[in-house]
Amino acid sequence: MSLNLVKALKLHNEKIWDIDCYKGLLATASTDRRIKIVNIGDIGDGLVSDDGRLLDELDDSSHKKTVRSVAWRPHSTILAAGSFDSTVSIWAKDENDGDADGDGGVDDPSSFSMELLAVIEGHENEVKSVAWSKDGYFLATCSRDKSVWIWESDEMGEEYECISVLQEHSQDVKHVVWHPFKDILASSSYDDTIRIWKEYDDDWEAAAVLKGHEGTVWGSDFEKNVNTDIVRLCSGSDDTTVKIWRCVSNESIEEDWICEATLPNVHGKPVYSVSWSEDGLIASAGSDGMLVIYKENKDNVWEVVAKHEHSHSIYEINVVKWIKLNNGKSYLATAGDDGYVNIWAYN
């Protein structure tokens, strides 16, 4: 098994902290306060230049500090961006721009444009992560202020109401992620824990606290298996490990979770990002610049099936995500301190 670099895209002159991709539209978040939208849909067929097809560069005056996180709303071209200036901006593509057939893709890149819909305020400090629920009805944000906020959105993505402020973490909250099929939220923190949140009696409550990491938990991702009711989560930490967690009881608001596995310890430095593919593969990346793929065998044992050292030269990798492109195939996208987004094929 191997990882092959398909394309290296130099998109920023400063660090790229986060990326998200929807129908070939890649959004980036950077220290330079810019958000770039790049069409990489045909990259798997070798049709994209070294710089990608830049569709839009969102106004760097919209945020006063680093843009830390970006997330496309499911099944739409509405984008949320969280910043160190403590705000979240909401952007949308003009549905008539560059999309003649209305499928959310890009038919005419020359007429593509994004507009600012809203700016959400509430956090007292840096916003570290933003994430949409499965249907785009809820937006979760987290911050250095130790809180997780859940916002209710209207259909157009223009109005946002805070419906819950979750303040059970004791330190900086680094990351939030929703379950792909259920209204379950996971938050990862500098307090070394992951917290699971569920809606109960029109309010959001802590369902579980996952303890086991011996350092900051930088991020997590849910399993995306539609053929099971089992809920599992992978996480990456400052302690250099990747762990698998499983819910073993959810008969009430309080759930019982166990640490099901600690994956083979390949990383020598903090793991900043993990991503669980629809095919069941887990990818991890972090401070050591190594990209690793794990697979669960028939005996339910996790094995390393591919790894690539120095994936961004000497630089740290801040994010890894599985993405699907126009040819229907899955690829890995990584972004790092070098300002590059690298697209990888797993063979």
From Swiss-Prot:
Domain of life of the source: Eukaryota
InterPro entries hit by this protein: CIAO1/Cia1 (IPR028608), G-protein_beta_WD-40_rep (IPR020472), WD40/YVTN_repeat-like_dom_sf (IPR015943), WD40_repeat_dom_sf (IPR036322), WD40_rpt (IPR001680)
A GO cellular-component term linked to this record: cytosolic [4Fe-4S] assembly targeting complex
Swiss-Prot/TrEMBL keywords: Cytoplasm, Nucleus, Repeat, WD repeat
WD repeats: 11-48, 62-101, 122-161, 168-207, 212-255, 266-304, 311-347
Entry keyword Cytoplasm: yes
GO-annotated biological processes: iron-sulfur cluster assembly; tRNA wobble uridine modification
Family: Belongs to the WD repeat CIA1 family.
Quaternary structure and interacting proteins, as annotated: Interacts with NAR1.
Record-linked PANTHER family: CYTOSOLIC IRON-SULFUR PROTEIN ASSEMBLY PROTEIN CIAO1-RELATED (PTHR19920:SF0), WD40 PROTEIN CIAO1 (PTHR19920)
Its job: Essential component of the cytosolic iron-sulfur (Fe/S) protein assembly machinery. Required for the maturation of extramitochondrial Fe/S proteins.
Protein name, per record: Probable cytosolic iron-sulfur protein assembly protein 1
Organism: Vanderwaltozyma polyspora (strain ATCC 22028 / DSM 70294 / BCRC 21397 / CBS 2163 / NBRC 10782 / NRRL Y-8283 / UCD 57-17)
Source taxonomy: Eukaryota, Fungi, Dikarya, Ascomycota, Saccharomycotina
Gene name tied to this protein: CIA1
